[in-house]
């Protein structure tokens, strides 16, 4: 048993020393997709938005067939929409905004096409998602109603997603990537009726650019 622990510690020290770490930051566009299912009927809606992120790239292996590493990060995601109508001379305004804090932990494979100039990569892994706020706001010239879905309805703020994507690194400094995070958990937290199962699943498509320090 002692020998086993010694091997684990030695392996961890080797990885810590051998791994090449690199900090990166990025911004981009995202499309938040929500699918609501009641019984056998589904309805989907989408919100446009943006994200800001920071990530750390740990290259664990660097071989002729490519590189393999782990890429943990932290990402702020915003998405929303607003609309305005006039009914019987009264202007009504409604808006929905979603704020998320995402923690992706990706396994990343890269292949160098042109030395120090062009690297293509693919990545996949879990994304731990925390809903910070889901604000629904309605107003007229005389009144304003504002609710937070996480506090005022049966909408869960936590989600576990599986993220997949591909990207390109340019000159070891710049990167472009596109991906999708598939939500696994049912975000509806209320009481269920057998004949009318209620489900809410969210997913996020994104495309962005980044800079590696």
Residue ranges and their predicted role:
Residues 40-44, 60, 91-95, 112, ...:
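Outer-membrane beta-barrel proteins
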Residues 19-59, 117, 131, 140-142, ...:
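Short glycine/proline- and aromatic-enriched beta-strand/turn motifs that initiate or cap beta-hairpins
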Residues 55-137, 202-213:
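Gram-negative (and chloroplast) outer-membrane scaffold detector with strong preference
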Residues 4-14:
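Sec-dependent N-terminal signal peptides
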Residues 75-83, 151-213:
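Predominantly the C-terminal beta-signal and adjacent terminal strand-loop region
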Residues 21, 44-50, 97-103, 156-162, ...:
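Residues that define the transmembrane beta-barrel architecture of outer-membrane proteins
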Residues 23-25, 62-64, 68, 115, ...:
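Repeated loop/turn-to-beta-strand initiation elements of outer-membrane beta-barrel proteins
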Residues 36-42, 82-91, 134-144, 188-194:
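Outer-membrane beta-barrel translocator domains and adjoining extracellular loop/strand segments
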């Amino acid at each position: 048993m002692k020998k086993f622990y010694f091997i684990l510690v030695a392996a961890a020290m080797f990885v810590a020393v051998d791994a090449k770490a690199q900090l990166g930051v990025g911004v981009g566009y995202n499309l938040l997709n929500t699918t609501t299912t009641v019984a056998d009927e589904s309805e989907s809606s989408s919100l446009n938005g943006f994200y800001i992120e920071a990530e750390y790239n740990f290259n664990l292996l660097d071989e002729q067939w490519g590189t393999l590493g782990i890429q943990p990060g932290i990402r702020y995601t915003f998405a929303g929409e607003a609309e305005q109508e006039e009914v019987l001379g009264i202007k009504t305004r409604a808006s929905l905004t979603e704020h998320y804090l995402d923690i992706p932990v990706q396994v990343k494979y890269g292949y160098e096409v042109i030395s120090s100039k062009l690297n293509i990569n693919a990545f996949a892994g879990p994304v731990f998602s925390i809903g910070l706020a889901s604000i629904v706001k309605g107003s007229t010239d005389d009144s304003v109603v504002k609710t937070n879905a996480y506090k005022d309805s049966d909408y869960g703020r936590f989600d576990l997603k599986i993220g997949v994507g591909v990207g390109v690194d340019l000159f070891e400094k710049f990167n472009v990537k596109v991906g999708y995070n598939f939500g696994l958990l049912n975000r509806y937290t209320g009481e269920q009726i057998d004949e009318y199962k209620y489900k809410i699943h969210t997913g996020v498509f994104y495309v962005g650019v980044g800079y590696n320090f």
